[in-house]
């Protein structure tokens, strides 16, 4: 199971939000490209980038930084979310060397867009689903819907997405531990990989996820924990490799 560092971009800086609130941010670095290089040096084999301004603006705002990170690490698989709302945006990111784009709110509000993008960019589309108590949330978590997250994820699997990034929003950025049960339920219901996100705090959480990784959990995104040092990234990836026999 891959441990995937999150680099959340806001106003050109690397930050973390608590539960998706733009006003509740902690700035970790003024130089996100250096942050990316740091995680690569610590053994990261994939990066998760989020354009937070883009998510709220509906179009890329920190795209130049994303492209700079991709250019600095041409062999590193990178996934980007935040403001992915048109094929032109997707094409620009893929041209810049990004491997996957993550469609979030637009996937829920306009599911046909996902199917069309999977046909246009096969193998490069991931859907990010945020859920609270099994129900899908959208618009930077401002809106919890009545849509069942498993039902929607299955629909996107049929459309051809490469993976689902699943965030339990009651736990993200709060260092409360991963909602393993909810993540496993989703992974068991589908054949494409699920990437867990939200709530990873320490090595125990890595251990707990590794114990169920064979249910279809291919990776885990970690943010606040590795920036606030409740989890040492290199130790976490080493433990994951050891437990999965990598």
From Swiss-Prot:
The active site is at residues 8, 130. SUPFAM superfamilies: Ribulose-phoshate binding barrel. It catalyses: 1-(5-phospho-beta-D-ribosyl)-5-[(5-phospho-beta-D-ribosylamino)methylideneamino]imidazole-4-carboxamide = 5-[(5-phospho-1-deoxy-D-ribulos-1-ylimino)methylamino]-1-(5-phospho-beta-D-ribosyl)imidazole-4-carboxamide. Gene3D superfamilies: Aldolase class I. One of its GO terms (biological process) is L-histidine biosynthetic process. Disulfide bonds: none annotated. It is an enzyme of class 5 (isomerase). It is found in: Cytoplasm. GO terms for cellular component: cytoplasm. Its EC number is 5.3.1.16. InterPro entries: Aldolase_TIM, His_biosynth, HisA_bact_arch, Isoase_HisA-like, Isoase_HisA-like_bact, RibuloseP-bd_barrel. Belongs to the HisA/HisF family. This is 1-(5-phosphoribosyl)-5-[(5-phosphoribosylamino)methylideneamino] imidazole-4-carboxamide isomerase. The lineage of its organism: Bacteria, Pseudomonadati, Pseudomonadota, Gammaproteobacteria, Oceanospirillales.
């Amino acid at each position: 199971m891959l441990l995937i560092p999150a680099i959340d971009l806001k106003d050109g800086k690397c930050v973390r939000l608590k539960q998706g609130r733009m006003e509740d941010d902690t700035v970790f670095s003024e130089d996100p490209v250096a942050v990316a290089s740091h995680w690569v040096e610590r053994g990261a084999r994939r990066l998760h980038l989020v354009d937070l301004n883009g998510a709220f603006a509906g179009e890329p705002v920190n795209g130049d930084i994303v492209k700079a990170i991709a250019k600095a690490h041409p062999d590193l698989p990178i996934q980007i979310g935040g403001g992915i709302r048109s094929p032109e945006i997707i094409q620009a990111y893929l041209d810049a060397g990004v491997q996957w784009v993550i469609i979030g709110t637009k996937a829920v509000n306009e599911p046909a867009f996902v199917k069309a993008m999977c046909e246009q960019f096969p193998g490069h589309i991931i859907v990010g689903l945020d859920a609270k108590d099994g129900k899908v949330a959208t618009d930077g978590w401002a809106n919890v819907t009545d849509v069942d997250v498993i039902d929607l994820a299955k629909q996107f699997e049929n459309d051809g997405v490469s993976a689902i990034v699943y965030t339990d929003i009651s736990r993200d950025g709060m260092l409360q531990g991963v909602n393993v049960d909810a993540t496993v339920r989703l992974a068991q219901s589908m054949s494409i990989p699920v990437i867990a996100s939200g709530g990873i705090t320490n090595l125990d959480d890595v251990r707990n996820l590794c114990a169920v990784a064979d249910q279809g959990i291919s990776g885990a995104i970690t943010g606040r924990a590795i920036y606030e040092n409740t989890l040492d990234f290199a130790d976490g990836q080493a433990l994951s490799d050891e437990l999965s026999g990598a």
